[in-house]
Regions:
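Short connector loops/turns at beta-strand edges and beta->alpha or beta->beta junctions
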Residues: 23-24, 56
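Basic- and aromatic-enriched surface patches that contact anionic nucleotides/nucleic acids
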Residues: 1-17, 31-191
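A short, surface-exposed helix-loop junction/capping segment
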Residues: 24-31
Protein backbone atom coordinates (compact mmCIF):
# COMPACT_ATOMS: atom_id res chain seq x y z
CA UNK A 1 0.00 0.00 0.00
CA UNK A 2 0.98 3.60 -0.42
CA UNK A 3 1.67 5.21 3.00
CA UNK A 4 0.25 8.49 1.62
CA UNK A 5 -3.19 6.83 1.46
CA UNK A 6 -3.31 6.46 5.24
CA UNK A 7 -5.70 8.91 6.88
CA UNK A 8 -6.12 8.60 10.64
CA UNK A 9 -7.31 11.01 13.32
CA UNK A 10 -7.83 10.81 17.07
CA UNK A 11 -10.73 12.18 19.11
CA UNK A 12 -12.24 11.94 22.56
CA UNK A 13 -15.83 10.71 22.71
CA UNK A 14 -18.24 10.18 25.62
CA UNK A 15 -19.92 6.87 26.42
CA UNK A 16 -23.24 8.10 25.03
CA UNK A 17 -21.75 8.33 21.52
CA UNK A 18 -20.73 4.66 21.66
CA UNK A 19 -24.17 3.68 22.96
CA UNK A 20 -26.03 5.79 20.38
CA UNK A 21 -24.03 4.16 17.59
CA UNK A 22 -24.70 0.69 19.02
CA UNK A 23 -28.43 1.44 19.11
CA UNK A 24 -28.35 2.81 15.54
CA UNK A 25 -26.31 -0.09 14.20
CA UNK A 26 -23.59 2.32 13.03
CA UNK A 27 -20.94 0.75 15.27
CA UNK A 28 -20.04 -2.64 13.78
CA UNK A 29 -18.59 -5.09 16.31
CA UNK A 30 -17.79 -8.10 14.17
CA UNK A 31 -15.55 -7.44 11.18
CA UNK A 32 -14.11 -10.53 9.47
CA UNK A 33 -10.67 -10.07 11.05
CA UNK A 34 -11.92 -9.70 14.65
CA UNK A 35 -12.27 -12.64 16.97
CA UNK A 36 -15.55 -13.49 18.66
CA UNK A 37 -16.52 -12.08 22.03
CA UNK A 38 -14.55 -14.02 24.63
CA UNK A 39 -14.82 -12.08 27.89
CA UNK A 40 -16.69 -13.60 30.82
CA UNK A 41 -19.21 -11.61 32.84
CA UNK A 42 -16.57 -11.28 35.58
CA UNK A 43 -14.10 -9.68 33.15
CA UNK A 44 -16.85 -7.38 31.81
CA UNK A 45 -17.77 -6.42 35.38
CA UNK A 46 -14.15 -5.60 36.18
CA UNK A 47 -14.03 -3.28 33.17
CA UNK A 48 -17.14 -1.48 34.46
CA UNK A 49 -15.46 -1.29 37.87
CA UNK A 50 -12.42 0.30 36.19
CA UNK A 51 -14.66 3.02 34.77
CA UNK A 52 -16.25 3.57 38.17
CA UNK A 53 -12.77 3.88 39.69
CA UNK A 54 -11.87 6.29 36.87
CA UNK A 55 -8.99 4.13 35.68
CA UNK A 56 -8.05 5.17 32.12
CA UNK A 57 -8.80 2.61 29.43
CA UNK A 58 -6.69 1.88 26.36
CA UNK A 59 -7.55 3.65 23.13
CA UNK A 60 -10.27 2.29 20.84
CA UNK A 61 -9.63 1.95 17.10
CA UNK A 62 -12.40 2.11 14.49
CA UNK A 63 -12.50 2.25 10.73
CA UNK A 64 -15.00 4.73 9.26
CA UNK A 65 -16.74 4.11 5.95
CA UNK A 66 -18.30 6.54 3.47
CA UNK A 67 -21.76 6.14 5.10
CA UNK A 68 -20.43 7.15 8.53
CA UNK A 69 -20.43 3.66 10.04
CA UNK A 70 -17.60 2.70 12.37
CA UNK A 71 -16.20 -0.83 12.29
CA UNK A 72 -14.28 -1.79 15.43
CA UNK A 73 -10.64 -2.60 14.67
CA UNK A 74 -9.60 -2.88 18.32
CA UNK A 75 -11.83 -2.67 21.39
CA UNK A 76 -14.47 -5.31 20.60
CA UNK A 77 -14.30 -6.93 24.04
CA UNK A 78 -14.54 -3.60 25.88
CA UNK A 79 -17.38 -2.18 23.76
CA UNK A 80 -19.26 -5.49 24.03
CA UNK A 81 -18.89 -5.28 27.82
CA UNK A 82 -20.41 -1.77 27.79
CA UNK A 83 -23.27 -3.00 25.61
CA UNK A 84 -23.92 -6.06 27.77
CA UNK A 85 -23.97 -4.08 31.03
CA UNK A 86 -25.46 -0.72 30.07
CA UNK A 87 -27.94 -1.77 27.39
CA UNK A 88 -28.31 -5.53 27.95
CA UNK A 89 -29.20 -8.41 25.67
CA UNK A 90 -32.95 -7.96 26.22
CA UNK A 91 -32.80 -4.34 25.08
CA UNK A 92 -30.63 -5.20 22.06
CA UNK A 93 -33.33 -7.63 20.92
CA UNK A 94 -36.46 -5.66 21.85
CA UNK A 95 -35.20 -2.05 21.45
CA UNK A 96 -37.77 -1.12 24.14
CA UNK A 97 -36.53 1.64 26.44
CA UNK A 98 -37.91 -0.10 29.54
CA UNK A 99 -35.50 -3.00 28.87
CA UNK A 100 -32.45 -0.73 28.81
CA UNK A 101 -30.15 -1.11 31.81
CA UNK A 102 -31.15 -4.70 32.54
CA UNK A 103 -27.92 -6.25 31.33
CA UNK A 104 -25.44 -8.43 33.16
CA UNK A 105 -25.19 -8.22 36.94
CA UNK A 106 -21.85 -7.05 38.30
CA UNK A 107 -19.77 -9.86 39.76
CA UNK A 108 -16.18 -10.59 40.68
CA UNK A 109 -15.43 -6.97 41.58
CA UNK A 110 -12.18 -6.30 43.42
CA UNK A 111 -12.92 -3.00 45.17
CA UNK A 112 -16.60 -2.04 44.87
CA UNK A 113 -18.04 -5.14 46.50
CA UNK A 114 -21.06 -3.18 47.76
CA UNK A 115 -22.47 -3.05 44.21
CA UNK A 116 -21.99 -6.76 43.40
CA UNK A 117 -25.12 -8.19 41.81
CA UNK A 118 -26.43 -4.84 40.56
CA UNK A 119 -27.42 -4.05 37.00
CA UNK A 120 -26.96 -0.63 35.41
CA UNK A 121 -30.58 0.31 36.13
CA UNK A 122 -30.11 -0.44 39.84
CA UNK A 123 -26.91 1.57 40.35
CA UNK A 124 -27.07 4.76 42.43
CA UNK A 125 -27.26 7.88 40.25
CA UNK A 126 -23.74 9.03 41.08
CA UNK A 127 -22.30 5.74 39.77
CA UNK A 128 -24.50 5.46 36.69
CA UNK A 129 -23.62 9.08 35.85
CA UNK A 130 -19.92 8.28 36.18
CA UNK A 131 -20.34 5.48 33.64
CA UNK A 132 -22.45 7.52 31.23
CA UNK A 133 -20.09 10.50 31.43
CA UNK A 134 -16.91 8.45 30.90
CA UNK A 135 -14.84 9.61 27.94
CA UNK A 136 -12.63 7.52 25.69
CA UNK A 137 -9.81 8.13 23.26
CA UNK A 138 -10.73 6.89 19.81
CA UNK A 139 -8.57 6.58 16.73
CA UNK A 140 -10.58 6.76 13.51
CA UNK A 141 -9.15 5.21 10.36
CA UNK A 142 -10.77 7.38 7.71
CA UNK A 143 -12.41 6.16 4.48
CA UNK A 144 -9.93 5.50 1.70
CA UNK A 145 -7.28 4.04 3.99
CA UNK A 146 -6.32 0.59 2.60
CA UNK A 147 -7.79 -2.49 4.32
CA UNK A 148 -4.26 -3.80 4.78
CA UNK A 149 -3.62 -0.90 7.18
CA UNK A 150 -6.65 -1.87 9.31
CA UNK A 151 -5.41 -5.45 9.60
CA UNK A 152 -1.91 -4.27 10.39
CA UNK A 153 -3.15 -1.96 13.15
CA UNK A 154 -5.17 -4.83 14.63
CA UNK A 155 -2.07 -7.06 14.61
CA UNK A 156 0.20 -4.42 16.14
CA UNK A 157 -2.01 -3.32 19.02
CA UNK A 158 -3.73 -6.53 19.99
CA UNK A 159 -1.15 -7.73 22.48
CA UNK A 160 -3.06 -7.33 25.77
CA UNK A 161 -6.11 -9.00 27.25
CA UNK A 162 -6.88 -12.57 26.23
CA UNK A 163 -4.07 -13.71 23.89
CA UNK A 164 -4.96 -14.32 20.27
CA UNK A 165 -4.87 -17.88 19.02
CA UNK A 166 -2.72 -18.74 16.01
CA UNK A 167 -5.87 -18.90 13.88
CA UNK A 168 -7.03 -15.44 15.06
CA UNK A 169 -3.64 -14.00 14.12
CA UNK A 170 -3.87 -15.67 10.69
CA UNK A 171 -7.36 -14.18 10.24
CA UNK A 172 -6.02 -10.72 11.07
CA UNK A 173 -3.07 -11.06 8.71
CA UNK A 174 -4.58 -12.89 5.76
CA UNK A 175 -8.29 -12.22 6.09
CA UNK A 176 -10.76 -11.31 3.44
CA UNK A 177 -13.59 -13.14 1.72
CA UNK A 178 -12.21 -16.60 2.51
CA UNK A 179 -11.86 -15.77 6.23
CA UNK A 180 -15.42 -14.47 6.29
CA UNK A 181 -16.66 -17.68 4.63
CA UNK A 182 -14.68 -19.89 7.02
CA UNK A 183 -15.98 -17.94 10.04
CA UNK A 184 -19.59 -18.39 8.87
CA UNK A 185 -19.01 -22.08 8.20
CA UNK A 186 -17.44 -22.64 11.63
CA UNK A 187 -20.60 -21.27 13.26
CA UNK A 188 -22.83 -23.77 11.45
CA UNK A 189 -24.22 -26.64 13.50
CA UNK A 190 -22.95 -29.15 10.91
CA UNK A 191 -19.38 -28.24 11.87
Amino acid sequence: FNPKEISINTKVIPMDVLLRRLKQGTLILNPDFQRNEVWTDVRKSQLIESILLEIPLPMFYVSADEEGRWTVVDGLQRISAFRDFILGATYMKSKRSEDEGLGIKLKGLEFLKNIEGLQMKKLPNNLSNRIMEAQFSLTVINPGTPDEVKRNIFKRINTGGVPLSSQEIRNALYGGKISSLLKRMSEMKSF
